Amino acid sequence: MDFLKLSTSCAAICGCGLVILAASLPPARGQTPDSSPAPAPAVISGTPVQPASPPATTTAPAPAAAPAMPAASDDDLLVPDKPKAAAPTASSDDDLLGPMPPKPGAAASSDDDLLLPQGGKPNAAAGAGGVLFPDGPQRAPANLPPGSMPPAGVIPVVSTGDAAIDHAKMLLAEKYPSASICATCHPKQFREWSFSQHAYAQLSPVFNTMQATIDKRASGTNGDFCIRCHTAVGMDLKEPVFTSNLNRNATSREGITCITCHRIRENYGKVSARFGLVQGDILQPMYGPKGNAILKQVLAQPDVFQVVTKPGEAGRAIHTDVVKFDPLEKSAFCGDCHDVNLLNGFRLEEAFSQFHNSPANKEGTTCQDCHMGNTPGIKSGFGFGPAAMVGDKPTPSRKLTNHTFAGPDYSIIHPGLFPFNTKAQELASLAEWLTFDYQAGWGTDAYEKTAPADFAYPGRWKSVDDRYDARAILDDQFSRLEDVNHQRYQIMRRGIQLHALNVEQNDAGGIKFKVKVANNTLGHGVPTGFDAERAYFMQATVTDRLGRVVFRSGDRDPNGDYRDIESQYVHDWKLPMDKYLFTLQSKFLVTLIRGGERVQILPSNKSLDPLPFVRPPTNADALTGRSPGARKQAVVIPPGSSRWASYEVRRDQLTGQAPYKVNLKFITQMVPVNLLGEIAEVGFDYGMSPKQVGDAVVDRSQTIWDKTVVLPSKPVMIDLTPSEADVLAPPYKPFLTVAAPAPAAKQAVKVADTTPLSRN
């Protein structure tokens, strides 16, 4: 995301590709700090990664603070509310690549992070903490009342016994009803949403860290651009852009929650989530595609359905109206968020634009037809049944849509936190769930019957009954995760398919073959959306009759990356580049000062100015024929199209032990591991280390196709097109592998009662 049309980096000047802002990279997978791996551990900019210094006391390290400048109430997000700050002086030239004029008499900063103002002293307006200085204390932004933020280094743990809520928090809850309230009458829709990408949007530790890194590198001027899609409620509440989700309002944590769509009353269009939510408690009207005909029937029978429509009345609170809002059934409504265009003109995501120009749109198919229908990824009709269960009484049947929205993202966090589960929320707080060791088998007979009586559990889990209750909830969570994983496999298999294997040569002189990879959809490219960070790739492995590997492409380095130019092991010349790699991951290209371009993982320019800013462009890209700062090189497969992956096994690689066979795996992974190393400087939520995040991202990736073919001795074209049964088949492996319960160790295990943002 070169969100910044700024001065070119020092790295760009020399073209060496070194990253100025060093970032922590996850240790090699499967290695321990005491091991001697070969090849050597990854380094960044030639410097071995060092863990952050541990705190001097048992107090958790402070979470990375919110950006130093709170957003203003207007839309530009570039000017703080109070006090008014002087606008930065622009360069005299139009390309915005020149340095800012220095202050009279001030010398440039000598440090190389280029984030300090001139003179090398911290920005007085930013204070000692803030997003530019993540090790400093956390401060309450100016638009929050005193006492709203926890003390430095402490994230409060809310006990289940804390039933009292102050009046202000109660009002916030009323303005933005939680999905858990909607679940009372809409259990089907709630369950589908509970494990959806929409529900996970704000909980994702990868997203939150990426948002914070971008804001840090842009001196806070990116504002809420990214996060306002992920939690419109949180931004309406003026929450800090970057803070632990444990600090956020309950509805804010729900990401794209019920009211994000059903409390919108205007047709905004492609506004990158710059829309307004209608505020009000659960009694206020909702907005839906069908209007209020069924609701009127319910309201006309209050004795039957036991509903109330006025505050203070005894009964089941219900919204008083459903206002018919036709755009909810139109593709343009999805374009509110799914076309992401930055204020500087950079086109980051183009899912809706791709659809708008697709064959599917020309045929009259909508986004909702394929993504809310009976079968993920295909126009397959909709369900029919009661839209609500009011008490134990169903409402009259009508068209039903699927709110799962299965796609490429998946959860890497504790199953007590996600999927959303009302019983889990009632049993324990998020921080308490983080201390429940489900992988050790807590709450299972196998564990509890062998656990020592003196084992020291965290306070919330001292009771064996509570541990059994937690395990029962988690069993339901595991079921939900497998459910959405199956839907994810279906939609990925629907979109990306292996259609043919063309064997061109197989003799003593070598082996040549090609694989046809097709976009089987007509609605948009594959991948789409955030395609520059989607690690979709082919693994091709050729073995002889004895099982010895003679050729491999698409294999991973010890960090979990494939061997392209962004692999740290390739970058450091510890592994060769995979010249046969087939990947659908688009690339960010940044402009060098001499006019060339190079790939950059997170293309936020390292400005020559003391403080980089996100600024609107001063001229149209069409005038120059190129972006002045960065661009995205798309390698996605267009709708209904295909690409060939070509491979060649040299003569000297053959063993003479024919027949040879090739195994083809197509893998979809939500982000590459190298991105995690690039953004790790600000830490990850829930106390997760970069290695934990990287391991989970890799371990839960999907092998959507796995085919083995014995290579014939003569040239031939082999059809690999999958059947409908193949598309709908179960995944090759479970989504979440829970370790077998082991007897508890006899020594006490100390578990902190606070959960910090990790910098380790």
Which residues fall in each region the model found?
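An acidic-aromatic substrate-binding cleft motif
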Residues: 175-179
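Conserved, well-structured interaction surfaces
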Residues: 232-239
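Compositionally biased, proline/threonine/alanine/serine-rich low-complexity intrinsically disordered stretches
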Residues: 30-161, 736-760
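Primarily the internal scaffold of c-type cytochrome electron-transfer domains
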Residues: 131-173, 189-218, 222, 239-606, ...
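Sec-dependent N-terminal signal peptides
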Residues: 1-33
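Hydrophobic alpha-helical transmembrane segments
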Residues: 222-230
